[in-house]
Structure formats: C-alpha cells, structure tokens
Amino acid sequence: MAFNFNWSPLMADASFYTRAQDLLTAALNKSPKPPIIVDDIIVTELNLGSIPPDLEILEIGDLAEDRFRGIFKMSYTGDAFLTLKTRVQANPLNTYLLTRPSFASPLPLAAATPLTIPLQITLSDFKLSGFVILVFSKQKGITVVFRNDPLESLKVSSTFDSIPFVRDFLQREIEAQLRILFMDELPAIIHRLSLRLWVPEYRAGEDIQTQPEQTAGEGPGQDPLASPPQDPVDSLGNALDESEIASLSLDSSVEAHSLFSQKNLLRLGALTDSQRTLSLFTPSIQEVVYRAWTSPSEQGDANGISTAPLSPMLSRTHSQVGSMSSFQDSASIVSSQSRSSASTHTFSGYGLNLGAGRHSKAHSRKRKKRVVDLRRPKTTSDTASVSDESAYTETASNPSVCSAPLPVVNEQPDPITPPLSPESDFRLPAIPERRRASLSRPVPRRDIATEMLRETGGPSAEPPRHRPQPADVDATPRGSLRAHITAQHDNEKQETGPSRQLPSTILPFTDEKSSSSTVDQALVERLAGEIARRMRDEKLMPTSSCGGAFWGRPDHEEYPPPAYGQ
C-alpha cells in the first residue's frame, strides 16, 4: 500500500510560511530562555526544502474517505533550513552574576558591565528519525504525535562561529530547545495549520480575532480639540475666544498643548504646592505647619512661633506660686485648718515649679535672721527688752513655724547622751545658753502656764521648787527627775483643765525661768498678764493651721527631757 505526498504546494504557498513563522516565533519565546539570550527569538526565514520525508506505514487503525489514523516510521534528511535573530550577552561574567545570589558574588563594577551583541542563527541539515502517530480528519484537521525524540542532528551556523566556545555552547542550547519543540510545540503548530486549511469556520474565527488588533493599531487618533474645555486659557493664563478655539487644529502651527482649563491649572498648582496628599479635595488642618512648606529659615520662625505661647504660661505659673508663698507667709490670713493641710499646700507648691523650693528656703533664712537680730547679751535689761509679745505675735501669725523646731534641733551641738528610747521624738533636750535665744518663740508658753496657775489659785511656791534642779551638774538622766516632773505635769493638768495641755517644749524654758533669779518679778507678771489676755483673744479666733492642731492634741504625752550638760 502506498501514498503519494504532494510536497510542492507547501513550498509554493506564501501564506503558509508566514503563518508558520508566527507560530514558530511564539513557540520559541514561550519556553524559558537561557540567561545568555537577552532578547526575543524571531524567525526571519523558513523553508521546508524540496526533499520530502520518508514515511513507512506500520499500522492503520481507521481508514475512510474523510478520516485516517495510523502509525508511521519517519526519516528525514533534506534541505530545509530555518533562520533566527536575537541578541545575546557577550560578557559571561554578567551572565554569571545574574544567575547567582548577590551575597555569594564579589560584585565587580566595570568587569560586570553588560555587553549585548546581535546574533543570527541558521539551522540546517536536519536529520530526523522516529515513530509518528498520524490522525487525519476534515473536521478536526491533522494531529501528529512523536512517540520518541525524532531529532538526531542538525547544523547550527551563527555569528560566533569563529569562537569555538560560543559555537559549541549555541549548538548544545539550540539542540535542547528543538527537542522540546518537536515533542510539545510542533504537534500543536501542525494541528492549527491543518485547521486553517480544511476548516473554513476556524479560518473565519481567526480572521475576526485578528481584525480588531489591526484596527486598534491603525487609523487616526482622537482629536482632543473636538470637545474643548469650558474655560480655555493659553499657557500665559489668558482666556481664549470661541473663534480662536475653532481656528486651532492638530496641523496648525499654534501650540495645542497650551490650551488648558483654568480649573485644571489651579488644581495642578495646589497639588504641586501642597506636597502632602494625592487628593485635590482633602480638607486642610488648621494651625498646622507642614514640613514641605517651610525652608530651613522658615522652620526657625515656625519654631519660634510654636514656643512663644509657652513663655506666658511659665511666667503665670511662677506668679501663681509666688502669690501662694506670700499667702502662706502673710501674718493676717489663716491658710488652712490643720497642720496636715498646710504641709499639703507646701509640697504642692514644690511640685508646681522649680522656683517654689528657692522661695521657701529664702523665707526660712529670713525668719531665722529676724530671730537672731532680736537676740541680746544675757543681762537683766536685755532680757527685759526682748519682747515676748512680738515673738508670740510672729508665732501666732506665721503658719510656717510648724517645721521650724526641727531644723533647730538638728543644729544642736554634740550631745552628751543620746535619747534612750523612740519616745524621744516628743522630748527636746536642754539648749545651751548660746542657742536659747533662737527659740524665743515658745517662751510665752512658759509665762502663759505661770499666769494660768496664778489665775486658778495654784501654789505660789511652785516656781521655787524648780530652782534647785539646774544646780545638778550630773549629765546623766535620772528616774527621780522624770517621776518628779511627771507628777508636776499631772498637777498642772488638773489645775488648768483639759483644754490647757502644754507640750514638753515648755519644760526646759520653765527651768530657764527658774534659773534666772535676776528677772524683775513685776515685769514678768505684767508681761504674763498681757500674754494671757492675748491667749483669751486667740481662743475666740479660729485656730491656725499649725498652732491649733499642735496645742490641741489630746493624745500628746509629755515627758521630761534627758539631763544634758548646761
């Protein structure tokens, strides 16, 4: 059984070659190319030659007038050739670096510069041999499937034939690509070509698909002057008349790109100036200076503007704290009702600003200096000249004397015997003669106690009982002294009543008064009467923040101080 193939019509049909070239170009660029090829592979020439292939029938499965299916053994050694064009990378170091990770390469500079060279490749002298399954149908076209790799050899001629390394490399790469082409792409190409030849519907469908592509790429473009803007202006911003717009055309010498809408120009200007948003309609934020708006000189001005409002706030804060300090130091205004509230105001003043600490220290030094200025040498006339009334007035009017005894106690010179128990917090040691004047403020309490004892009818011999005590030169504390003074304090509390409790701070000054035998008794009684009158007036007034809370504590226990050296 024999078949006659008419090979010459395939060679003479120009449309067949054009279509075959397009299909081969798409097939060669479909698969991933090697890194050395940096451009598309284009089939520029295709010729099947004048020698047909040899076919040997091995099996016929179906045979009819319009269909055929069989298995053939094909062998081809003809004069067909194929010409390709592409661009390759001539610098192998660049190709090597592109295929390697950056951290594993030395990253050269000039040595890795890419160098692309155009390349033309001609494939000829094909030798094919293999088993082919051929299925023919007028409705479905021709289907050719290779059961094995049909390519045995071919000849590759290129621009780099003079370089053996490049020639051998191209030979290997092209053979590998052609083997994939024969096994996968060539059957699909043959099937599409057969459908175009024998199936009119498929040909009409392809023509419809290719027609929009041609019309889209050809023909005149749209005229932008067909629908001019509503408010046209030129490049200088001058408005244009309708007659001027009508005279414009794409072929005229007038610059058509100068015809812009004023609204669009404003929007573009706003977008260029803002540099903060991609939307033209984003609302701006009030009292905000954007970084893109300011130059280095303007940034300094902006910083000055932003920091200026802070200065008045700081000055007002200082003024407020200063007024609070003066309010606390005033002798005519009572600041609070308890010592704890006064302490709270004092520490809140420290927390408000840094200057409050300095103000309080300055005031404390001034008060100490006033007391020192009132001190006189210890004589009869000088002792009488020290006005207990003025000292008491300062104590009653200044609420900040609550913390005054503590620094004075800390300034005590080296004691002979330290306190023996934690209860010593309520006891104050005897103060030497050079320090007694600094605590002249509690002295009126001593006279007040004496006056109260006189008014309630207490024994007049009580002060002489305390005169022998300072004669004791022994500095060690004694239990008999503590028991004696405790009994004396109980008698005083019974005589004066529960509302006349006196702290332990008056005991040393009681001893001081008993030891001062040269003081005029008449002057002391007159001063004591005046102070008692002031005490009665003080009871009618609201209690101060420090004095009332301190003298009115019912749970305050009084203990005699330890016997220190004179």
Curated annotation (Swiss-Prot):
Compositional bias of kind Basic and acidic residues: 444-454
Organism classification: Eukaryota, Fungi, Dikarya, Ascomycota, Pezizomycotina
Classification via HAMAP family: Mdm34
Membrane topology: Multi-pass membrane protein
GO biological process, one term: phospholipid transport
Function as written in the Swiss-Prot or TrEMBL entry: Component of the ERMES/MDM complex, which serves as a molecular tether to connect the endoplasmic reticulum (ER) and mitochondria. Components of this complex are involved in the control of mitochondrial shape and protein biogenesis, and function in nonvesicular lipid trafficking between the ER and mitochondria. Mdm34 is required for the interaction of the ER-resident membrane protein mmm1 and the outer mitochondrial membrane-resident beta-barrel protein mdm10.
UniProt main location, coarse: mitochondrion
One GO CC term, this protein: ERMES complex
Entry similarity comment: Belongs to the MDM34 family.
Chain positions covered by the region annotation Disordered: 212-237, 349-401, 432-518, 539-566
Subcellular location: Mitochondrion outer membrane
Top-level taxon in the UniProt lineage: Eukaryota
Annotated PANTHER family: MITOCHONDRIAL DISTRIBUTION AND MORPHOLOGY PROTEIN 34
The encoding gene: mdm34
GO MF annotations, alphabetized: lipid binding
Protein name: Mitochondrial distribution and morphology protein 34
Comp. bias regions, Polar residues: 380-401
Start-end of Basic residues biased regions: 358-370
Keyword Acetylation: no
Entry domain remark: Lacks alpha-helical transmembrane segments, suggesting that it resides in the membrane via beta-sheet conformations similar to those predicted for other outer membrane proteins and porin. The SMP-LTD domain is a barrel-like domain that can bind various types of glycerophospholipids in its interior and mediate their transfer between two adjacent bilayers.
Assembly description: Component of the ER-mitochondria encounter structure (ERMES) or MDM complex, composed of mmm1, mdm10, mdm12 and mdm34.
Keyword tags: Lipid transport, Lipid-binding, Membrane, Mitochondrion, Mitochondrion outer membrane, Transmembrane, Transmembrane beta strand, Transport
Domain SMP-LTD span(s) in chain numbering: 1-195
